[in-house]
Amino acid sequence: CVRLQLVDFRGRRPQVTRQSIERPLFITGLPRTGTTILYELIAQDPSFRSPASWEVTRPIPPPKEASYNSDKRIRSVDRQLALAEKLSPGFRAIHAIGAELPQECVYILASHFISEQFGYMYNIPKYRSWALSQDMTASYRWHTNFLQHLQVDFGAEHWVMKAPAHLAYLKYLVAQYPDAAIIWTHRKPLDAITSFSSLVCTLRSGFSNAINPLAIGQHEMQHFSKIASMGMLDRSALSARQVFDVS
């Protein structure tokens, strides 16, 4: 539904296609390595804009600067997120969610149908493996289309965005955003994946009554080991001045 609305709006507002996304900042790294707290910290800088949960969830019409902090959709999305906590009790204590908090890029990419978001919520290992093998050129082009839409009535000097999943697709990200800067966060992998596996168990409890923590932990370790390897391979082809490490 969101995708159809965005495509329709883009066709009726040609100025959307003329929006320029300049020098965006992307935060990535294994999950539970401090990406979220760093994201929310940098988003406080007035020279950056981050896509808020409410505008990613309900992007039609594009947000306006004058009503950005009072838009009626904020309240509606907050109610929706409260329902998510009822479905997966305890999730909010593990990972902060809120209509006005910065949202991850997996939710933007989900409307292009290739996204880690689905694998976090459901036990779909074949899909996740398939997604890692896909050419993401069109997906990151869609990512740009989404940002163009969000800023058409509320310009952004620079965007700051975040998703651990970008680690698997750095070559596609940089091909779409050649002037992007990338922050790669670090933590002991065992600690990071153990913490993330706990998050996945909690999140999936809202969609399944067959949660196997051991199987989830084993799969997440294998999955993100592959993602980290993909990220290191892609990074070797990037300028050292484009990627910054934080630990």
Q: Language-model segments: what does each one mean?
A:
Residues C1, W54-T57:
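Catalytic cores of glycan-processing enzymes that make or break glycosidic bonds
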Residues C1-R23:
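Extreme N-terminal, non-catalytic leader segments
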Residues R12-P14, S133-H158, A163-S247:
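PAPS-dependent sulfotransferase catalytic domain
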Residues Q19, L30, K162:
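Residue-level marker of regulatory loop/turn positions in helix-turn-helix DNA-binding domains and
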Residues R23-L25, H158:
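Alpha/beta-hydrolase fold active-site loops
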Residues F26-P46:
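Glycine-rich phosphate-binding P-loop
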Residues Q44-W54:
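Post-Walker A helix-loop "phosphate-sensing" segment adjacent to the P-loop in P-loop NTPases
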Residues V56-W159:
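PAPS-dependent sulfation machinery
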